[in-house]
Design a protein with these regions (language model features):
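Glycine-/charge-enriched secondary-structure boundary and capping motifs
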Residues: 1-21, 37, 60, 80, ...
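Glycine-rich phosphate/pyrophosphate-binding loop regions near the starts of catalytic domains
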Residues: 10-21, 31, 37-181
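Short, low-complexity, intrinsically disordered N-terminal modules
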Residues: 27-28
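Glycine-rich, charged/polar anion/phosphate-binding loops
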Residues: 49-50, 141-143, 164-168, 217-220, ...
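Short, acidic (Asp/Glu-rich) active-site segment that either coordinates a divalent metal cofactor
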Residues: 63-66, 151-153, 167-223
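Short helix/loop capping segments that flank catalytic or ligand/cofactor-binding pockets
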Residues: 73, 189-191, 244
């Protein structure tokens, strides 16, 4: 079972290169100085006080996102190793920050854990979480713990920033803009389908990174914002068909996409996974001008254009049909 709460927090703090309150100010000072040296957001006070105290970069606005992950809905322990669960929990928030062109700064983790959960599982969760956090210079600044009467529950709040007035919103698309996506779509959903069918048992996360260890497009999002290339942007977490509709609704526009242009992992035969699968954590964005074929080492593909009105259509084999939002829906659809 997990350690008692105080000991658990101390263990998490040590994993995050900080110290529990019992270690005194010296450990916390070392932590703060280390992050000052590496240029991470100005953490003035982290784990050990009632609130974290952070200083935003001068002239920046705060970006705040929260994501809730529930066992048997967003992950299953029999399928997902704890390192993958921790990684994926943070990746969801990082992808939101990427979609606004921001820089991630600090994370807060609230965990509810069942009494019978091995401490080794908790250690693995934070190994995955903190490994991804380190990659993007994100500091674990606080959180909460509780006992769960059922499965594992993880709530992640992520703080980021962008120069004031520059964050890329969903509402900036205009008729005539081109539609682009980064990377490939549908690989994560294909792995999930194999897990559900039983064809894939105890897979290696390193062999199927799109599903188990996705990497959010932080650098690409930053460049799209900084160079003013994107007029509107959203991350693809619920599926292209659904997230495209979210963007169009916020902008008050429609869209036309071309099936043969969608970069579906596995080719045209896997198009349905690319359109409706979700968990891609790629970026969907609109642009008024031409965009490079690659940004920050990630491929960029033009898949269509923004149109007047509110209709969203797919052109396939020369035929145009309305594209329904067939991706993830929290109420009324089966768990992932």
């Amino acid at each position: 079972m997990p350690l008692p709460e105080k000991a658990l927090i101390a263990r998490i703090a040590r994993q995050a290169w900080t110290a529990a309150p019992a270690a005194g100010a010296r450990g916390r000072d070392t932590y703060q100085k280390a992050h000052t040296r590496t240029g991470v957001a100005g953490l003035r006070r982290g784990i050990g006080d009632d609130c974290a105290v952070l200083q935003l970069p001068s002239g920046h606005a705060a970006l705040v996102t929260t994501d809730f992950s529930l066992e048997e809905v967003h992950f299953r322990r029999r399928w997902h190793p704890p390192e993958s669960v921790g990684h994926r929990c943070l990746a969801r928030g990082l992808s939101d920050i990427a979609a606004m062109g921001g820089k991630p700064l600090a994370a807060f983790v609230s965990l509810a854990l069942p009494a019978g959960l091995p401490q080794e599982w908790v250690d693995g969760f934070f190994k995955g979480f903190l490994g991804l956090a380190k990659r993007f210079s994100v500091v674990l600044a606080g959180g909460d713990t509780s006992q769960s009467p059922g499965g594992v529950l993880a709530d992640i709040i992520l703080l980021g920033s962008a120069p004031a007035g520059t964050a890329v919103l969903r509402s900036g698309a205009r008729a005539g803009d081109s539609l682009y996506v980064t990377g490939e779509l549908g690989a994560a959903a294909q792995v999930l389908a194999q897990l559900r069918s039983g064809r894939l048992k105890r897979p290696s996360p390193r062999r199927y990174p799109a599903h188990f260890l996705p990497i959010p497009r932080i650098a690409a999002g930053h460049i799209l914002r900084a160079r003013r290339l994107a007029s509107a942007m959203i991350d693809i977490s619920d599926g292209l068909s659904t997230d495209l509709r979210h963007l169009c609704e916020e902008s008050g526009v429609g869209a036309r996409i071309y099936a043969e242009k969608v970069p579906a992992a596995g080719g045209a035969a896997k198009l349905r996974f690319a359109l409706h699968g979700g968990d891609d954590y790629e970026l969907l964005f609109t642009a008024k001008g031409k965009v490079p074929d690659s940004i920050a080492g990630v491929s960029v593909t033009r898949i269509g254009e923004v149109t007047r009105g509110r209709k969203i259509v797919l052109v396939e084999d020369g035929q145009e049909r309305e594209l329904p939002a067939g991706g993830w829906e929290h109420f009324g659809r089966r768990p992932r």
